[in-house]
Amino acid sequence: MASLIYRQLLSNSYVTNISDEVSEIGARKTTNVTVNPGPFAQTGYAPVDWGHGELSDSTLVQPTLDGPYQPTTFNLPINYWMLIAPTQAGRVAEGTNTTNRWFACVLVEPSVQSTRREYVLDGQTVQLQVSNDSSTLWKFILFIKLEKNGTYSQYSTLSTSNKLCAWMKREGRVYWYTGTTPNASESYYLTINNDNSHVSCDAEFYLLPRSQTDLCDQYINNGLPPVQNTRNVVPVSITSREIRYTKAQVNEDIVVSKTSLWKEMQYNRDIMIRFKFANSIVKSGGLGYKWSEISFKPMNYQYTYTRDGEEITAHTTCSVNGVNDFSYNGGTLPTDFSISRFEVIKENSFVYIDYWDDSQAFRNMVYVRSLSANLNDVVCSGGDYSFALPVGAWPVMSGGAVTLSSAGVTLSTQFTDYVSLNSLRFRFRLTVSEPSFSISRTRLSGIYGLPAANPNNNVEYYEIAGRFSLISLVPTNDDYQTPIANSVTVRQDLERQLGELREEFNALSQEIALSQLIDLATLPLDMFSMFSGIKSTVEAVKSMTTNVMKKFKTSNLANAISDLTNSMSDAASSVSRSASVRSISSNAASRISTAIQASDDLRTVADASTQISSVSRSLRLREFTTQTDNLSFDDISAAVLKTKLDKSTQISQSTIPDIISESSEKFIPMRTYRVIDNDTAFETGIDGTFYAYRVDTFDEVPFDVERFNKLITDSPVLSAIIDFKTLKNLNDNYGITKTQAMELLQSNPKTLKEFINNNNPIIRNRIENLIAQCRL
């Protein structure tokens, strides 16, 4: 849209001429100052390094089989299996809690008749009765005594061909494997004090966490993995296990370089991306057997998660690109099921996820380099969608899946309800996965991809984990704003030129062709195309653009947006992060919502008119920060400005900044705004007029102030290019369909142009009145 020029001026109004800054500093200071801007481009798009760089891994990997350790005496950790692997018969291990429990384990070779053998247990030589009737299996025997000078009694046995046994301390008990392999299982025979019980082991051993009990079962019954038996694995001391493993700190801010004015900050962050798809399902008219469209739509999602103990508020926008159009036609009869178009994403498609959070990294995302990211993959599976037919069994679209794999990251801008946010755009390539999708009761089946009918499969969100790293150029002083050199003096000849130029601009309103104006208002005018028709400034576009931005920085519109942005930024960086982005945004919207009181407080129509007028003056900011495809007052004013700049004979490089700044404030002063709630439209004007009416009949209904207050906070605000009086006059004299009415209510540029080309006097008169308001 043409109003892109105003958005561009707002987002780039910080740009200044570096040489001017150096000259100004040198005039005030006696010391030499060197400004090195570094490898950054002063454009709307920061340079991006697509190299992955060095990516540290924040995952602490704990080995499943920890060992082998040398024979030793130590306090066995709670909730860990001690897997003992002796190589010969004899004493294997013993332990005690030093008060009322002594236990010992011995290993007996195969084919041993009942006999008494001597063992050294608890520092004493004792004789124990042992036996092993098996000719192939080794036998572990567990003995326990309850007194220091008591006698050991046999409690349990484990027969095994692998010469492996294991025990674990947990819940005040000792757990032990018993039975015969390959069907041995765990049990417990002893209650002890876990904190003070020590174990003395005469053989090599391993440690396994309790979470790997199933794996311990496998080792006991089937033996150790081959790598433990075929390689020369050297046992280490148990003291080596006391080394504390710490996670690498990946969420960090690093000062890369620093000068007097600027510093480069490297931000490394873990990231949790949550997103969901949105879709639109449109049913055709008729008997109810046909659907016109099933398509993907962009979807905003707000959520919170914890990063290094800090609660992060995040905002994502998910959109798709490169969709594939499919259709199904069951026949030509009105009762034949058909879908005119349904979208599917597959290998040639991309998914874009714009991510922003309230951390420090995103507050300084203006000039960025060395941007990289490392993300995992996610599988998105389609769910079922039933096509509700009036009669007969319902066809069901089901299945379909794609895998999203990271394909790069760049900078982007998210437009929230109140402000645009510098964010990261993660791009994902797609690969199709099982299952394919189909529509029951039709011949359509075996197609791969993810259809738009139910892409979320009734899950709350999809989640992707990973991390990103970037280097951002920020002011050295964290509280310092980027300096802007502003001129405070105006020469008398410049004021004279401006006076003459204003008169010429106002006279040129009669020479604007309405049809061409609508076409121009729908073009995305940028800085260059706006000024390309001015011959005297073509060779100095860069310098002139910088001067325009400097001047626009001081305009009322820029100041209002700046105040709104600052309040948004301050709220996002506050100590309390529990509120969502929408809740934070509502703080910035208080300038609008607090201007309206409850209907009980509106004593008279005059009071309501005063408050509605106050609200309407603030609605331009609300509309300005919400980008839509509909025509706005700023689109028309920018198109008028472009037309007059091309036609003017007195425009010059020195006068353009003032003219553009003035036009943003003075063009179309009598604006009217509209919000639509189902079949009811609320319309308010700068002059305090307000209407509520039905969109299908244009009959007025009572103006619900409380409902209006909620709508302007949560719903898009539209420019009322064709206001209520004009619409009612048009309907009374010419008659319009409901579709035409909705398109006029939404300021659809194509519909407006059709009425103008048909020389409709009511619409032409309304547009001409708006052009006449574009005065300086």
Swiss-Prot record:
One of its GO terms (biological process) is virion attachment to host cell. Residues 484-511 form a coiled coil. Residues 248-479 are annotated as: Spike body and stalk (antigen domain). A motif (YGL motif) lies at residues 448-450. One of its GO terms (cellular component) is host cytoskeleton. It comes from the Viruses. Keywords: Capsid protein, Coiled coil, Disulfide bond, Hemagglutinin, Host cell membrane, Host cytoplasm, Host cytoskeleton, Host endoplasmic reticulum, Host membrane, Host-virus interaction, Membrane, Outer capsid protein, Viral attachment to host cell, Viral penetration into host cytoplasm, Viral penetration via permeabilization of host membrane, Virion, Virus entry into host cell. Disulfide bonds join C318-C380. The record marks R231, N232, R241, E242, K247, A248 as: Cleavage. Residues 389-409 are annotated as: Hydrophobic. A motif (DGE motif) lies at residues 308-310. Residues 65-224 are annotated as: Spike head. Residues 510-776 are annotated as: Spike foot. InterPro entries: ConA-like_dom_sf, Rota_A_VP4, Rota_VP4_MID, Rota_VP4_MID_sf, VP4_concanavalin-like, VP4_helical. In group A rotaviruses, VP4 defines the P serotype. Belongs to the rotavirus VP4 family. This is Outer capsid protein VP4.
